[in-house]
Each structure stands twice: as structure tokens, then as C-alpha cells.
Amino acid sequence: MGQIQYSEKYFDDTYEYRHVVLPPEVAKLLPKNRLLSENEWRAIGVQQSRGWVHYAIHRPEPHIMLFRRPLNFQQQQEAAAAAAAQMLPK
């Protein structure tokens, strides 16, 4: 069985992006005309940190999944968690 391959991250002013190349035996599990939820892409074996969204299908190469998430997503999540922790009674 082939391995799932992950690109390096790349960026624009709003998002960070990455693409994931699926081996043929995994790619055949993809639905043809819709994007996958996080639970669905995790179920087929894609492993990434939180916040990534399957945002587009590149029709000529449907075995390549395109993902994006807002810039600084992880820092925003950490800041929100720290703020919530400060609100807990001591």
C-alpha cells in the first residue's frame, strides 16, 4: 500500500495551504463531487493538525486533496485556550 504524501505549507495574505497526495487505493475512496469534512478525511488516513479544511477539488488530479486554514490558526487557538484557562476559578 502506498503512503500518503504531504506538501510543505505555502501561504498568501489570508491562508496557509498544503496539498496531500493520496495513493491510488486511498484515492478511490474519495467521493467524486464533494469536499470531505475533517472527520471524513481523517477516516481515510490523512493526518494533520486541527483547523485544516478541504477547500477545493482539482478535477484533473482528484487524488490530490487541497487544504487551507487561516494564517496564525494555531496561535489563535492557543490564545483562546489560555484566556479560557484564566477564567476558571482557582
Swiss-Prot record:
Pfam families: CKS
Family: Belongs to the CKS family.
SMART domains assigned to the protein according to its UniProt record, in alphabetical order: CKS
Name of encoding gene: CKS1
GO MF entries: cyclin-dependent protein serine/threonine kinase activator activity; histone binding; protein kinase binding; ubiquitin binding
Keyword Cell cycle belongs to the record: yes
Cellular component terms per the entry's GO annotation: cyclin-dependent protein kinase holoenzyme complex; SCF ubiquitin ligase complex
Organism: Oryza sativa subsp. japonica (Rice)
Protein name: Cyclin-dependent kinases regulatory subunit 1
A biological-process GO annotation: cell division
Coiled-coil residue spans: none
Function: Binds to the catalytic subunit of the cyclin dependent kinases and is essential for their biological function.
Expression induction or repression: By auxin.
Source species taxonomy: Eukaryota, Viridiplantae, Streptophyta, Embryophyta, Tracheophyta
Keyword entries, A-Z: Cell cycle, Cell division
